[in-house]
Regions:
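A generic short-segment signal for beta-strand/edge and adjacent turn/coil regions
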Residues: 25-27, 54-66, 96-102
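Polar/charged alpha-helical tracts
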Residues: 4-8, 12, 74, 103-107
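Short amphipathic alpha-helical segments, especially helix-boundary/capping motifs
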Residues: 17-23, 69, 80-83
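Catalytic cores and adjacent binding grooves of peptidoglycan-active enzymes
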Residues: 81-148
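Active-site acidic/histidine clusters and adjacent loop/turn architecture
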Residues: 1-57
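Extended, low-complexity, intrinsically disordered C-terminal regulatory tails
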Residues: 41-80
Length: 148
């Protein structure tokens, strides 16, 4: 699938305003898709449509914790040192999955990882499903679980 087809298919499940902070959406509207990486979007589509097959809600609050974050987001502004994350780079999202705990969702993704078009990371030990496609030097697993 090319990028346009991926976004068109994702529209069945998500609006871009759910995946980016309010600052980004208020400035760029539907063009906000441009800030989300194709590999992240493609994995998100496969996870939602083919693996989990259940509604996913992106954690989207005033602090923009689970979505693409920009320099205006409170969480970013409060940092006292250099701050880069997969969220800032348009390669991550935090979700809740209707009908599944985060651990159940992570387990299902690991079991069906052969369907994923790109390697990805998941955050373990948290009550939400964090997924990202931030490349990891020296990590060869298709699905890598990290804890911070």
């Amino acid at each position: 699938m090319n990028r346009e087809q991926i976004i068109r298919e994702l529209h069945r499940f998500f609006q871009v305003r759910e995946l980016v902070c309010s600052h980004v959406f208020s400035k760029w509207g539907e063009r906000s898709w441009q800030f989300l990486s194709t590999d992240y979007l493609h994995n998100l589509l496969v996870i939602r449509r083919d693996i989990l097959q259940m509604p996913m809600v992106c954690s989207h609050d005033a602090g923009a914790h689970g979505v693409l974050r920009c320099n205006m987001c409170k969480m970013v502004k409060e940092k006292k040192a250099a701050y880069l994350s997969s969220h800032i780079l348009g390669r991550a999202g935090d979700f809740s999955v209707q009908g599944l705990t985060a651990q159940e969702a992570r387990s299902r993704i690991r079991t069906m990882q052969n369907l994923l078009p790109y390697p990805m990371r998941m955050e373990g030990g948290v009550s939400w499903l964090h997924i990202d496609t931030l490349p990891q030097f020296g990590i060869t697993e298709k699905v890598y679980e990290f804890t911070e």
